[in-house]
Amino acid sequence: MATIAIIDYGMGNLRSVQKGFEKVGFEAVVTADPKVVLEAEKVVLPGVGAFRDCMRNLEQGGFVEPILTVIQDGRPFLGICVGMQLLFTDSVEFGLYQGLNVIPGHVLRFPEGMRERGEDLKVPHMGWNQLSIKRRPSAFSDVEDGANVYFVHSFYAKPDEEGVVAATSSYGIDFCAAVWKDNIVATQFHPEKSQAVGLSILKNFALSKA
């Protein structure tokens, strides 16, 4: 049984996530086999690219049912970037596309014309930004309020229930930077690119029981 399975569905820099786990002393298997995902103790869903394409690849790769089974079984599950967005009901990127609907809510685009401190803000939101911690899953046990993490995204998730928001950040608007629901932790930012803070998240996720 693979302790940690990173889903390879053709969308994302999977090796960087795998190397992140290696840096904190854990082996993670990158797999395109739904059976390996189904048998894993912990599962990571990264994601880079368009929501529509990511969801299509999950479906075509046969990953949807294994993902839902892992989540329903209560096994630790980590979503990263678009991997977080896919957990929501739908996204308006390039139309309206259905997600996994594990966390009720919608994925929206940053509005045009945002300004902050008198400056126009460009989309995508790219670079380092601060977290405001709202709730603290075990994966965030070493993350300080105000910690800086690395983002690259034009869309953000808006949960129907505020209670699932683990952290927010601000870029013209306050937006959900991380969610926590039962055995699911998911981040809009990239822990594998967020240096010591991100590595602590990967380490504590690897140590988590649920």
Curated annotation (Swiss-Prot):
Its EC number is 4.3.2.10, 3.5.1.2. Keywords: Amino-acid biosynthesis, Cytoplasm, Glutamine amidotransferase, Histidine biosynthesis, Hydrolase, Lyase. It holds the Pfam family GATase. It catalyses: 5-[(5-phospho-1-deoxy-D-ribulos-1-ylimino)methylamino]-1-(5-phospho-beta-D-ribosyl)imidazole-4-carboxamide + L-glutamine = D-erythro-1-(imidazol-4-yl)glycerol 3-phosphate + 5-amino-1-(5-phospho-beta-D-ribosyl)imidazole-4-carboxamide + L-glutamate + H(+); L-glutamine + H2O = L-glutamate + NH4(+). It comes from the Bacteria. CDD domains: GATase1_IGP_Synthase (cd01748). One of its GO terms (molecular function) is lyase activity. It is found in: Cytoplasm. GO terms for cellular component: cytoplasm. The active site is at residues 81, 190, 192. The keyword Amino-acid biosynthesis applies. Residues 3-210 form the Glutamine amidotransferase type-1 domain. InterPro entries: Class_I_gatase-like, GATASE, Imidazole-glycPsynth_HisH. The keyword Hydrolase applies. GO terms for biological process: L-histidine biosynthetic process. Pathway: Amino-acid biosynthesis; L-histidine biosynthesis; L-histidine from 5-phospho-alpha-D-ribose 1-diphosphate: step 5/9. IGPS catalyzes the conversion of PRFAR and glutamine to IGP, AICAR and glutamate. The HisH subunit catalyzes the hydrolysis of glutamine to glutamate and ammonia as part of the synthesis of IGP and AICAR. The resulting ammonia molecule is channeled to the active site of HisF. Heterodimer of HisH and HisF. PANTHER family: IMIDAZOLE GLYCEROL PHOSPHATE SYNTHASE SUBUNIT HISH. This is Imidazole glycerol phosphate synthase subunit HisH. The gene is hisH.
